[in-house]
Every structure is written in structure tokens, then in C-alpha cells.
Swiss-Prot record:
Annotated positions binding heme b: H88
Record organism: Columba livia (Rock dove)
Domain Globin positions: 2-142
Protein's UniProt name: Hemoglobin subunit alpha-A
Keywords: Heme, Iron, Metal-binding, Oxygen transport, Transport
Binding site for O2: H59
Gene: HBAA
Similarity remark: Belongs to the globin family.
Tissues/organs with expression: Red blood cells.
Claim: Membrane is one of the keywords in the record: no
Biological processes, Gene Ontology terms: hydrogen peroxide catabolic process
GO molecular function (one): haptoglobin binding
PANTHER family noted in UniProt: HEMOGLOBIN FAMILY MEMBER (PTHR11442), HEMOGLOBIN SUBUNIT ALPHA (PTHR11442:SF48)
Description of how the protein assembles with itself and partners: Heterotetramer of two alpha chains and two beta chains.
Pfam families the record matches: Globin
Length: 142
């Protein structure tokens, strides 16, 4: 997925505004993922999956930090997430569709907390961005 200059600007602007809340948003997105797509819980049998769990919040923060890292290096997402891509492809072996599902959940959480930010144009840019991140994370599966 090719991000235009306008897409990149939109993504950077959103991440600048969500700033310090990214970790909380990541936790909420992960919890939403588990509720909406219960099959995704299979990768976390050792987690306390109850509402507000410290483990969900902690992993959600890692997810958000990866998205922030990708946004900060939007011209080289593959380079920024290379180690994470290796981890998911070689060790964790997460089904690639789950990245798309989690990306969608993250967009929903951003929309809930920052509705004025999510204009149709910005929504399209963020959608392209999370798809690009998912593509990078699954690139080493082959």
C-alpha cells in the first residue's frame, strides 16, 4: 500500500494528537479485538483476558508503541519494524489476518476517542497506514 505525501501528513498529525494516550488506546484496541474476534485469544492462553487486565494493557501498549514507531519512520516502515516482523513470522507465527483485524480495532478506538480527527480523508489515510504496517509484519512469512 503506497502512502501519498498527504496520507503521511495525516498519519503524523493523528499520532501527534493522540500522543501520550497511544498506550491506552492500544490496550483498548486489543481488548476490542478479543471481544469482537474471540478466535484471536488463542495466541494469548497465558494472559488474563478480563476487562482492564494489566496484561492486555501492557501488550496493547507494545502494539501502540509499534504503531508510533511506524508513524515516526513512515518513509521506512519496513526498517522500523524489521525485528518485530521477524518475531511474528519466525517465533510467534501469528495468522496474518489478525494484523488487519487489530488495525481495524485501533481505527475504531481512535474514532471513539477522537471523532473530530477522523474525517473521511484521515480515515482513509489511517486505514492505508495500518494496512501498510500489517503488510510489513507479514512480509517475512514467505
Amino acid at each position: 500500500m503506497v502512502l501519498s505525501a498527504n496520507d503521511k501528513s495525516n498519519v503524523k498529525a493523528v499520532f501527534a494528537k493522540i500522543g501520550g494516550q497511544a498506550g491506552d488506546l492500544g490496550g483498548e484496541a486489543l481488548e476490542r479485538l478479543f471481544i469482537t474476534y474471540p478466535q484471536t485469544k488463542t495466541y494469548f492462553p497465558h494472559f488474563d483476558l478480563s476487562h482492564g487486565s494489566a496484561q492486555i494493557k501492557g501488550h496493547g501498549k507494545k502494539v501502540a508503541e509499534a504503531l508510533v514507531e511506524a508513524a515516526n519512520h513512515i518513509d521506512d516502515i519496513a526498517g522500523a519494524l524489521s525485528k518485530l516482523s521477524d518475531l511474528h513470522a519466525q517465533k510467534l507465527r501469528v495468522d496474518p489476518v489478525n494484523f488487519k483485524l487489530l488495525g481495524h480495532c485501533f481505527l475504531v478506538v481512535v474514532a471513539v476517542h477522537f471523532p473530530s480527527l477522523l474525517t473521511p480523508e484521515v480515515h482513509a489515510s489511517l486505514d492505508k497506514f495500518v494496512l501498510a504496517v500489517g503488510t510489513v509484519l507479514t512480509a517475512k512469512y514467505r
